[in-house]
């Protein structure tokens, strides 16, 4: 009976797939002309390869905790890129943009929605096709 939990643990570790945090998804924006850390999880010692549509390839080997990271260097601004992360499985990030990344943080006013604005209908109709927003699901960071 003592061997069953160990067997289950080993089964989970051996069948681990490459995973990425939610921030790395389709429509991702990376800072142009710089090194961008990209990380995730995989089975310990599994080779993880990251290939970009702009011709760069990186590889990493997760430690005993399954964590891995590479620093992907980006070209000048552009859109329509793709990033493929491969280990025992494959994840393809589509419609990746390279450009300027702005991080906005603050107090409660950072959660102000367009619907609460003075001219909400007018603001909602603004066409900004190159503008992408990522909002963290976490509301409190303390």
Task: Report each predicted region and the residues it spans.
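Accessible peptide chain termini
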Residues: 1-2, 142
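Sec-dependent N-terminal signal peptides
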Residues: 3-13
């Amino acid at each position: 009976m003592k061997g069953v939990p160990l067997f289950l643990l080993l089964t989970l570790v051996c069948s681990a797939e490459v995973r990425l945090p939610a921030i790395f998804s389709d429509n991702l924006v990376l800072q142009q002309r710089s090194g961008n850390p990209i990380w995730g999880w995989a089975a310990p010692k599994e080779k993880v390869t990251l290939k970009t549509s702009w011709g760069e390839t990186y590889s990493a080997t997760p430690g005993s905790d399954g964590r891995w990271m590479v620093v992907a260097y980006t070209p000048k601004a552009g859109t329509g890129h793709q990033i493929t992360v491969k280990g025992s499985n494959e994840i393809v990030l589509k419609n990746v943009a390279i450009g300027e990344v702005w991080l906005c943080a603050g107090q409660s006013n950072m959660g102000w929605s367009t619907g609460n604005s003075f001219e909400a209908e007018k603001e909602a109709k603004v066409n900004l096709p190159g503008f992408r927003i990522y909002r963290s699901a976490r509301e409190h960071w303390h």
